[in-house]
Amino acid sequence: MKYLDRIADKMLRLRLEAFGAVQIVGPKWCGKTTTAMQQSKSLIKMQDPDKREGYLATARTKPSLLLKGETPRLIDEWQVAPVLWDAVRNTVDERNQKGQFILTGSTVVEDKNGEIMHTGTGRISKMPMYPMSLYESKESTGSISLRLLFDDPAYDIDGLQSDMTVEKLIFAACRGGWPASLDVTSQEAQLLIAQDYVNVICDEDISRVDGVRRQPALARLIMRSYARNICTLVKKSKMLADITVEMEKTSMPTFDDYVSALQRLFVIEDVEAWCPAIRSAAAIRSGAKRCFVDPSIAVAALGMSPRSLELDLRTFGFIFECMCIRDLKVYSQALGGRVSYYHDRYDLEADIVLHLADGRYALIECKLGSREIEDGAKHLLQLRDLIREKNKTEHQMPLREPDLLIVMTGGEMAYTREDGVKVIPLATLKD
């Protein structure tokens, strides 16, 4: 398969220039190892079945031997031997050179045995990686740059068009951003990747992540409940009640344990609330918005197909929002981006608040169809006006006004409304 350029490529190059080592973290199958291999000069795969035991024996006795090789040296699935973390850190200190190692792994390491003595602060830079955005999978036209939207107030987007119909967006969400799915000819086979991903997570990885035996059936129920409530503010107690209909003895601590394991596997990645001081704390919703790292996980967990989603556009609206969140995380990485949401008791909301490292931010609503654009724009303008009203009385620490108001759509044409709200099809965006 020909390597498709990733937005992470540039991020990795910059981090290798700045740090002695880079740790790439993210869900399995999202392309971490393949991306790292484009810039590494030597490689060791810790999970190679023919060499694993020998590698582990070496790690126990003299881990520095595993670090010998041309640099940058890629250590794939390093968490198999957590002691390698300190070995990398010490070697970086001794060599005092940049770009020595790349570490990849698909789990957050729980160091129960005390094998990691030090953090990697200043030596090992952590770089998140996600499944492919629509631009990386060559489906977004990339005619609208997220960076330019922030940097250039006069940036003209009017008339720029997406090549993706709603049907194509639905298929892309069902297939997901898994690189392996793009190396398959038939659409039926492409859809199997996400389905198999969910099976592997539930049957194997959820127990393997920390060595605690967990029930695949319960893992499936929890993922299905999450999928039913994707991009909503549903409480854990409601999801637990949903699950106990089929598994009566499931407790909240058990539910929390499974969700925590799925978070360590980078499967679940909830969206936190944005709570600016524009209303009383009690008026602003502060619970997490339920989200997967890729929309295809929700589709597979629900057992849905492109056809069933075409007949249920209400459900696809939530899955579309998950796809918007994934792509915005990818596109905003170089800008230090992070996402949150806003929702208050008066039903004033912004589906996504995209924050940049320098303090700039965008309020974003995700609306699949053109009929919903007016409603989305209305919410954004009301929220901006609320911030302005608050600033009239808050002179010491005024809240920054949003730099952008955007309605992300599944439509085909981009334009700027007279009120300044930008209407942007998801499949026109790039970084």
Language-model features and meaning:
Residues 24:
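Hydrophobic anchor at the beta1->P-loop junction of P-loop NTPases
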